[in-house]
């Protein structure tokens, strides 16, 4: 119950507070909106009662699927959740960036994950990421992230939490000057490597990650809703977080990934 109480406060503060206001464009973080003009209907399966796993005070919404069909849905009315609410995926946004990089690989825009990212990005070529491979960006194994001590500072900059126009992904990456190890030696969870991946996608395509994802990956999940995505002051999508979709579409995304893995 202690965890549930903490989780409930987290949902109220983050999902219904700062993050929700950002999604609506009311906070300091700019947001882009991509309208789904051809919404699909997710197939329903035989219902299962999974309340023992998901019916908690702090659980905002939950969708479970089996064989690509919805078998369980729950929307916490006390937290004003509903099927049409576009929920913030938090760090699952990183997964969407990874899928977008995968799309560029499959379509030949990237030759190999073992290429240096700087082969495709002038901004990364002029940074400490000059020699880092795309594979090690995706693995968070650049050797640049020793720990998460400096993460909050960078995250606040990228989200424009200072509200002073310093939310520039490229400048954040260029401000980093030191490594702690050679790339590929160890994976360290951090915002910087996925930020570099977002820059990579933008400089390959001259489009934001959000736009490339929306046009090429999103349709394949048969989405019911639209999507929102945080951007910096150059309309470059944040990689660390900031993607909002309907709960069903987060489930559809997971189902799509499972099918891709097993195909």
Predicted regions and their residues:
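N-terminal leader/targeting segments and the immediately adjacent pre-domain N-terminus
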Residues: 1-79, 106, 110, 139
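Non-transmembrane alpha-helical segments in soluble domains
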Residues: 51-54, 102, 118, 135-138, ...
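Active-site helix/loop module of the DD-peptidase/beta-lactamase fold
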Residues: 107-145, 175-178, 205-241, 245
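Active-site SXXK
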Residues: 68, 87-112, 137, 197-201, ...
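Active-site-proximal alpha-helical segments within enzyme catalytic domains
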Residues: 193-200, 239-262
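Flexible glycine/proline-enriched surface loops and loop-helix/loop-strand junctions
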Residues: 81-83, 177-183, 193-195, 232-239
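Catalytic cores of extracellular degradative/oxidative enzymes
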Residues: 120-124, 143, 147-167, 174-181, ...
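Solvent-exposed, acidic/flexible segments
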Residues: 43, 47, 57-58, 85-93, ...
